[in-house]
């Protein structure tokens, strides 16, 4: 056997350039300048010489790709344009490859929408000099067939990215990845490794069937799914994960549009991040929806009482009772199916034990029939024949049970039940995402209340300073989270315990700010005292430190000569002009102080406006997300009920067929035994 072209064939089979010009991977949009005609002729001769020395057939994937290129109605016979085809590849023009890829993508889309489509995992193989297993997927219809190979990690990355692209849909599950310990055990026990590979093939088939035939149409039309079935992306799946729409999704899904995560609205990047959120984990450390809904009712009441802008009815948000019941039902169903899964494992173990018993019993009966035949030799040895038939009937029974376990019990009952559990866990994952969005929504209100607290503190400072009572130290001590408030602190006493006088705030009306005017109105009507605290609404005096929202600050240009004047006044001797200088210095300091307060109030006004936009955006998203999840769960439960009914009917039918086959065997054995007894008599 010649091995001259062996490595060349392997290189051709594993080289991305096999699917076209490799320049498309570097720069798919800018063609390379064609080489001179002499170089073209030389390259053409080299290609012909290589083809003449090649004895091995072309890889299977070439037939798939060439089939896609011939699918165009305007394509001509290949022998007429062979030279032109090679020239286009050598020139570096990826036009033919692009056209072929577009044509194949259109074929995949048409194939997925074909009513006669069949999806199957036809093969699994291990890569050369590697422990990686690849699974061969076949999409076939009466007119089209596409074959592509995928690894387990590529199945998992497809599903993980579909979860991010469609956070309101339930994506079909795939089997969990094995731990390192189980991987080591599988390498030792080869038969167990084979059973795991076969199990994964069945799970992947169920995954693709549910994804294409029983899921939302959005999943079937997703470009990422089309690339998963595209042989051109077989060796460059990483490129598909770095292209739109996957590349448009932010790293943290809480900073994206929950309905369309690929939305590029810049406001989502300003949303607060909730610690502990892991979208790919099934662990949920938050309270149930019923408890969270009670907290939302409290939040709505607090907003009605303390919202300075005035509470609007469309901003009121609560969790519908349907969604709360869905969560309860999912947990209950998971518990029931988990118990059923444990019972199925015990049942399968008992069936296998019975098969082993029947094997031993059948073998012993056959040996016993031989011993009887040897002890009583003759032409009419009815006892030996009866024992042999008894053993054969035992063998038929064990074969029926073994076939039932391998072909019906495990793949058509036990594994689908386990898949239902994974489905329900995925639905709880959507509810967990919904909970974290609610927490994010509540944090926005906490941030807004903290800004209100800063607004009132600055208003108090402006009012007391303008009255000249020297109480700035008291009010400055109440601004626990405003880092810039220390610039406006003056030495004073902390003995001002009286109520605030709203007449001292008239100078703030010049700002013409709706929020500040509403704040002044509430101050005059509710008589908010200095002990009122916004962060007391949610417990703890450090909430403003934990939840903070700040926009970039542009410091105003103000006169800063007050400190120099004070130092000069301290060093100057006593004179009649000292009192006049002190009065002038105080007036300048008061003016600078008022300017600083106005600037801070304007800055807080901007932050409040931005928070109002975020709250309105998040509120709209929560209403849409709630409606989408309710619709998804209603459809999901109806599908689960149909799937469960089909599983039960199939399981009962398989059990009935097995027991009928065993009963038929034993009836035949009984009839043969009765007939032989009659003949003897």
Swiss-Prot record:
Has UniProt tagged this entry with the keyword Glycoprotein?
no
Instruction: Quote the PROSITE patterns the UniProt record gives.
Output: PX
InterPro entries for the chain: PX_dom (IPR001683), PX_dom_sf (IPR036871), PX_Snx41/Atg20 (IPR044106), Sorting_Nexin_Autophagy (IPR051079)
Task: Report the GO terms under cellular component.
Answer: cytosol; endosome membrane; phagophore assembly site
From start to end residue, where is composition biased (Polar residues)? 13-24
Q: Where is the composition biased (Low complexity)?
A: 482-497, 558-589
Q: How does it sit in the membrane?
A: Peripheral membrane protein
| Pfam families per UniProt | PX
List the GO biological process terms. Answer: autophagy of mitochondrion; protein transport; reticulophagy; retrograde transport, endosome to Golgi
**Keywords of this entry:** Autophagy, Endosome, Lipid-binding, Membrane, Protein transport, Transport
Q: What is known of its domains?
A: The PX domain binds phosphatidylinositol 3-phosphate which is necessary for peripheral membrane localization to the perivacuolar punctate structures.
Q: What does this protein do?
A: May be required for cytoplasm to vacuole transport (Cvt) and pexophagy.
Where along the chain is a 1,2-diacyl-sn-glycero-3-phospho-(1D-myo-inositol-3-phosphate) bound? 151, 153, 177, 200
Its taxonomic path starts at:
Eukaryota, Fungi, Dikarya, Ascomycota, Saccharomycotina
Compositionally skewed regions (Acidic residues) per UniProt: 1-12
Q: Where is the PX domain?
A: 113-236
Q: Which domain of life is it from?
A: Eukaryota
Query: How is this protein named in the record?
Result: Sorting nexin-41
Q: Which family does it belong to?
A: Belongs to the sorting nexin family.
The principal location of this protein is: membrane
| Keyword Transferase assigned | no
Question: Where in this protein does the record put region Disordered?
Answer: 1-94, 475-505, 558-597
Where located?
Endosome membrane; Endomembrane system
């Amino acid at each position: 056997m010649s091995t001259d072209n062996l490595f060349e064939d392997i290189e051709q089979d594993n080289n991305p350039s096999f699917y076209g010009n490799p320049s498309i991977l570097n720069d798919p949009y800018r063609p390379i300048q064609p080489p001179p005609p002499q170089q073209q002729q030389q390259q053409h001769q080299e290609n012909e010489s290589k083809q003449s020395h090649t004895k091995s057939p072309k890889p299977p994937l070439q037939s798939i790709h060439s089939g896609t290129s011939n699918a165009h109605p305007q394509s001509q016979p290949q022998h007429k344009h062979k030279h032109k085809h090679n020239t286009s590849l050598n020139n570096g023009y990826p036009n033919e490859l692009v056209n072929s890829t577009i044509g194949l993508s259109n074929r995949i889309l048409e194939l997925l929408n074909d009513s006669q489509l069949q999806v199957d995992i036809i093969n699994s193989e291990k890569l050369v000099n590697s422990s990686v297993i690849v699974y061969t997927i076949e999409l076939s219809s009466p007119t089209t067939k596409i074959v592509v190979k995928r690894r387990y990690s590529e199945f998992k990355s497809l599903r993980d990215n579909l979860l991010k692209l469609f956070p309101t849909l339930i994506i079909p599950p795939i089997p969990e990845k094995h731990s390192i310990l189980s991987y080591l055990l599988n390498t030792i026990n080869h038969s167990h490794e084979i059973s795991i590979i076969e199990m994964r093939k069945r799970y992947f088939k169920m995954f693709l069937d549910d994804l294409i035939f029983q899921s939302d149409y959005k999943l079937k039309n997703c470009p990422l799914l089309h690339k998963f079935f595209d042989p051109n992306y077989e060796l460059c799946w990483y490129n598909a994960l770095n292209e739109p729409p996957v590349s448009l999704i932010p790293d943290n899904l809480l900073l994206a549009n929950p309905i369309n995560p690929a939305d590029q609205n810049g406001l989502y990047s300003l949303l607060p991040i909730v610690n502990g959120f892991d979208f790919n984990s099934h662990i949920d450390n938050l309270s149930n929806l019923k408890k969270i809904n009670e907290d939302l009712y409290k939040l709505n009441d607090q907003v009605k009482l303390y919202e300075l802008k005035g509470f609007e009815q469309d901003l009121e948000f609560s969790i519908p009772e349907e969604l709360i019941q869905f969560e309860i039902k999912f947990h209950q169903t998971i518990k029931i199916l988990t118990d059923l899964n444990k019972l199925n494992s015990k049942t399968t173990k008992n069936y296998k034990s019975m098969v082993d018993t029947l094997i031993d019993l059948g073998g012993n009966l056959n040996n016993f029939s031989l011993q009887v035949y040897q002890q009583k030799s003759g032409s009419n040895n009815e006892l030996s024949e009866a024992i042999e038939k008894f053993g054969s009937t035992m063998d038929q029974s064990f074969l029926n049970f073994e076939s039932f376990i391998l072909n019906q019990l495990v793949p058509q009952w036990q594994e689908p039940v386990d898949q239902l559990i994974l489905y329900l866990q995925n639905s709880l994952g959507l509810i967990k995402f919904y909970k974290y969005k609610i927490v994010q929504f509540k944090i926005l209100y906490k941030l807004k209340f903290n800004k209100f607290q800063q607004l009132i503190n600055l208003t108090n400072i402006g009012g007391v300073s303008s009255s000249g009572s020297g109480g700035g130290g008291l009010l400055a001590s109440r601004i626990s989270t405003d880092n810039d408030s220390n610039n406006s602190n003056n030495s004073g006493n902390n003995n001002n315990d009286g109520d605030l006088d709203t007449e001292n705030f008239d100078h703030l009306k010049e700002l013409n700010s709706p929020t500040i005017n509403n704040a002044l109105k509430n101050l005059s009507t509710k008589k908010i005292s200095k002990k009122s605290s916004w962060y007391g609404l949610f417990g703890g005096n450090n909430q403003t430190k934990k939840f903070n929202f700040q926009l970039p600050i542009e410091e105003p240009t103000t006169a800063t000569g007050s400190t120099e004047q004070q130092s000069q006044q301290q060093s100057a001797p006593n004179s009649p002009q000292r009192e006049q200088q002190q009065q002038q210095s105080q007036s300048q300091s008061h003016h600078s102080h008022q300017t600083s307060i106005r600037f801070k109030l304007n800055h807080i006004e901007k932050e409040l406006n931005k928070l109002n936009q975020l709250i309105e955006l998040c509120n709209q998203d929560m209403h849409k997300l709630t409606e989408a999840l309710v619709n998804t769960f209603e459809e999901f439960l109806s599908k689960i009920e149909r799937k469960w009914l089909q599983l039960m009917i199939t399981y009962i039918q398989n059990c009935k067929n097995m027991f009928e086959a065993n009963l038929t065997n034993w009836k035949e054995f009984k009839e043969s035994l009765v007939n032989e007894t009659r003949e003897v008599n």
